[in-house]
Amino acid sequence: MASSIVSSAAVATRSNVAQASMVAPFTGLKSAASFPVTKKNNNVDITSLASNGGRVRCMQVWPPINMKKYETLSYLPDLSDEQLLKEVEYLLKNGWVPCLEFETEHGFVYRENHKSPGYYDGRYWTMWKLPMFGCTDATQVLAEVQEAKKAYPQAWIRIIGFDNVRQVQCISFIAYKPEGY
């Protein structure tokens, strides 16, 4: 019993020393009068405000007539074989699995089942063979694109980079469009 009394007294003296250097507890919010208030000034000079009005004339809207947007990089001209090779090398460098898909009727998102965009409208294409698991050479992917072009010359063909760890599609771009698109 005597040992417990001594130890509790030792603890009490330590806590008194620590409390002297502690910060005061939170006592609640102060009145709103101390917060800055924005006041409406009727004499504001509009010319001094920041503006991007000069740049607005430079902005353009994507023309929707005969210029459909497809996938990533669709705003650029068609990619050459050399540019496709670089894109596929980037895909492989990131450890993504290349996969080819093709669409014979619509190479863009369209609305078929309802007036509002649906989950299945134009987003799923037919897979060309199987995903190219273990592929390390970009020329193999381009050889498959050429083979798909021979089999379906009137189809859109896209290359997808699939991350099999996160199970997500990381990149998708059009590798071939039929004549006239």
From Swiss-Prot:
**GO CC term, one of those recorded:** chloroplast
Note the InterPro entries from the entry.
RuBisCO_ssu, RuBisCO_ssu_dom, RuBisCO_ssu_N, RuBisCO_ssu_sf
Q: What is its main location?
A: plastid
Subcellular localization is given as: Plastid, Chloroplast
Q: Per UniProt, what is one GO molecular function of this protein?
A: ribulose-bisphosphate carboxylase activity
Per the UniProt entry, what are the Gene Ontology biological process annotations, in alphabetical order? photorespiration; reductive pentose-phosphate cycle
Going by the entry's taxonomy, the superkingdom of the source organism is recorded as: Eukaryota
Question: SMART domains under this entry?
Answer: RuBisCO_small
> Which segment is the transit peptide?
1-57
- What keywords sit in the KW lines? Calvin cycle, Carbon dioxide fixation, Chloroplast, Photorespiration, Photosynthesis, Plastid, Transit peptide
What more the UniProt record tells us is:
The basic functional RuBisCO is composed of a large chain homodimer in a 'head-to-tail' conformation. In form I RuBisCO this homodimer is arranged in a barrel-like tetramer with the small subunits forming a tetrameric 'cap' on each end of the 'barrel'.
Q: Per its database record, what is this protein's job? A: RuBisCO catalyzes two reactions: the carboxylation of D-ribulose 1,5-bisphosphate, the primary event in carbon dioxide fixation, as well as the oxidative fragmentation of the pentose substrate. Both reactions occur simultaneously and in competition at the same active site. Although the small subunit is not catalytic it is essential for maximal activity.
The family annotation for this protein states: Belongs to the RuBisCO small chain family.
Name of the featured protein:
Ribulose bisphosphate carboxylase small subunit, chloroplastic 6
Species for this entry: Solanum tuberosum
